Regions:
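Flexible glycine-/small-residue-enriched beta->alpha junction loops
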Residues: 1-10, 134-137, 141
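Histidine/acidic residue-rich metal-binding segments in metalloenzymes
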Residues: 4-98, 102-120
């Protein structure tokens, strides 16, 4: 007998409902501001978010996390790391910091750059995109990220999309102000019905 989709849809997604239940009120509010307005998240709050995310992911069967991004190759890429840290007494502890959540450093030499950088300057960084929800799949916590070179050039398909959404919002707010709307703070563009 099959389950109703509504019973399990998004059950492995660290969505707004889960965040609200698991994060302290001040941290939830700060993260919501980051997600909706682009306000930088305080690094101490990033540690709290990372800890809640790790605990939730472990409860959903995750032992690893990955910074997940879409390089210019037309596919997806992942850099996996483990929550597991061995201890001196033969046990393990599960660790995940705000620094590990916010930024990763994969080798970018195998990804096309459109001639933006020399191969010797192949270091690239992933940066957490808090506007997309994290999720658990096959024992790994997937952290949606943007991917840029060490000098800031775009190496993925997501970064230009995020930048264009910001510009579109900014210009839409200008138009709304011309029409007398003084309360809107952001315009969100979507695709589809």
């Amino acid at each position: 007998m099959s389950k109703n989709v509504a019973e399990y849809f998004a059950c492995d997604v660290f969505n707004d409902e889960v965040m609200k239940a698991r994060l302290p009120k001040a941290v939830y509010k700060a993260l919501t501001k980051t997600r909706k307005l682009g306000v930088p998240l305080d690094p101490t709050y990033a540690d709290v978010v990372a800890n809640a995310l790790k605990d939730w992911a472990i409860e959903h069967g995750a032992t690893h996390y990955t910074h997940w991004f879409q390089p210019m190759t037309g596919s997806t890429a992942e850099k996996h790391d483990s929550f597991i840290t061995p201890t001196d007494n033969g046990m393990v502890i599960m660790n995940f910091s705000g620094k590990e959540l916010v930024k990763g450093e994969p080798d970018a030499s195998s990804f096309p750059s459109g001639g933006l950088r020399a191969t010797s300057s192949a270091r690239g960084y992933t940066a957490w995109d808090p506007t997309s929800f994290c999720f658990v799949k096959e024992g790994s916590l997937y952290i949606p990220t943007a991917f840029v070179s060490y000098t800031g050039e775009t190496l993925d398909k997501k970064t230009p999309l995020l930048r264009s959404m910001d510009v579109l919002s900014e210009q839409s707010i200008r138009i709304l102000r011309l029409f007398g709307n003084t309360t809107a703070t952001k315009v969100t563009s979507t695709v589809g019905p």
